[in-house]
Amino acid sequence: VVPSEERIGSVVLLLADGSVDGAPSFEARTVLNGVARVSDVSAADLDGDGDLDLAVAMFGLYKTGGALWLERRPDGRYKRHVIVQRNGVSHVPVADFDGDGRTDVLVLISQEHEELLLLVGRGRGRFEPYPLFAGPHPMFGLSGCEVCDLDGDGDLDVLFANGDALDQDPHPKPWHGAHWLENRTEPGGRPQFTHHELVRFPGAYSAVPGDLDGDGDLDVVVTSMLNRWDQPDRQSLIWLENAGVGAFVPHPVDTAPASLVCAEVDDLDGDGRAAVLAGGLHLMPPVHALGRVPAWFQRAPSGPR
């Protein structure tokens, strides 16, 4: 968990090779080793040759880190290509953001950089960088991003959170929250994104999309990692109702468990309604309201409670 300059990062493929006693069995194959701490891996055809390559994020600490892609060769080996040489890279989701049929790479760079960078695929493994968003100061706290069509207009937007404060002053900040980068790029054109702040929410560590009220559009769940032990009424989970035309209305969900760092939205019990599954990470003492993998199920059609 603790960031480090050590080159202890690796990428391991788990290849299905049958089953043992009825359970799936996998062969572990290391395709990258001896790099800065790996924080994310995404698979896609990045060079247009028909097979799956890998985009890799390496967080490192202050001097190490970056992003690269691993080109799958015909012999099954992987060739590395460096695409970002900066510390603090935490996420590398892949998608076609400009509608040209080629895969692009979104790079979230935290630490002192606080930037979202889009690497637009130009074919044959070539990428052109376009800055999409830059935080106003080095303590902005970028902590996670998701790719989704939040406004339902047929292209892919970016949903992101800034609630990381695991630095010299590990407390919730008033500028933490959830944000939406609205994709306004013309097909095949230069990337154009408009920034919208959705909500201020201290400690907002992740923001994930899902249709929570069953009305057919995407709402947003936001978790907080930094609940204060001396403020037990502070929310650790909220949801933002999509009210249309770019408006989102915040609703409280729960104050406990505290210190939630991730969430997923899905129908967990098969009742046709979305539920929320979250993950807790209790790092900052005094820890309270513990809960590693809590879930919230709907009992009414108006969102999780």
Where are these regions (language model features)?
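Beta-propeller-forming repeat regions
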Residues: 1-305
